[in-house]
Curated annotation (Swiss-Prot):
Keywords: Methylation, Ribonucleoprotein, Ribosomal protein, RNA-binding, rRNA-binding. This is Large ribosomal subunit protein uL11. It comes from Shewanella sp. (strain ANA-3). It comes from the Bacteria. Forms part of the ribosomal stalk which helps the ribosome interact with GTP-bound translation factors. NCBIfam families: L11_bact (TIGR01632). SMART domains: RL11. PROSITE patterns: RIBOSOMAL_L11 (PS00359). GO terms for biological process: translation. CDD domains: Ribosomal_L11. GO terms for cellular component: cytosolic large ribosomal subunit. Part of the ribosomal stalk of the 50S ribosomal subunit. Interacts with L10 and the large rRNA to form the base of the stalk. L10 forms an elongated spine to which L12 dimers bind in a sequential fashion forming a multimeric L10(L12)X complex. One or more lysine residues are methylated. Pfam families: Ribosomal_L11 (PF00298), Ribosomal_L11_N (PF03946).
Length: 142
């Protein structure tokens, strides 16, 4: 018989550095999940990734307090900032541009994000990520 799902918890945790402090501890503690068990499993799964990269994670909590989790790809905004070498986007993206990014790099990001986006082709995802880049104050070249 399948386990009864009690809750889904969505968090963004930095790769390789999950610990019981907020936001992980309170979110899991409310559902009675073993926090250290999650932290060890998450850190083991993300140890090969760049340290400090924000990783969206969906934790499925079952009624017997056991859990499973699924990691996603980093947010497009993080990948764009990293590719353009920026610390943050523009506070006024319509008037103040902060950098440029090649369309080929956006295509790479779209292909990386394809695992998380269902039902969209790579061309549509590329256009979506171009829009994200423009809203961050990046100029798309190429």
């Amino acid at each position: 018989m399948a386990k009864k799902i009690d809750a889904y918890i969505k968090l963004q945790v930095k790769s390789g550095s999950a610990n019981p402090s907020p936001p992980v501890g309170p979110a899991l503690g409310q559902k009675g999940v073993n926090i250290m068990e999650f932290c060890k499993a998450f850190n083991a799964r993300t140890e090969k990734m760049e340290k400090g990269m924000p990783i969206p994670v969906v934790i499925t909590v079952y009624s017997d307090r056991s859990f499973t989790f699924e990691t996603k790809t980093p947010p497009a905004s993080y990948l764009l900032k990293t590719a353009a070498g920026l610390k943050s986007g523009s506070p006024r993206p319509n008037t103040q541009k902060v950098g440029t990014i090649a369309r080929a790099k956006i295509q790479e990001i779209a292909e990386l994000k394809a695992a998380d986006m269902t039902g969209a082709d790579v061309e549509a995802m590329t256009r979506s990520i171009e829009g994200t880049a423009r809203s961050m104050g990046l100029v798309v070249e190429g």
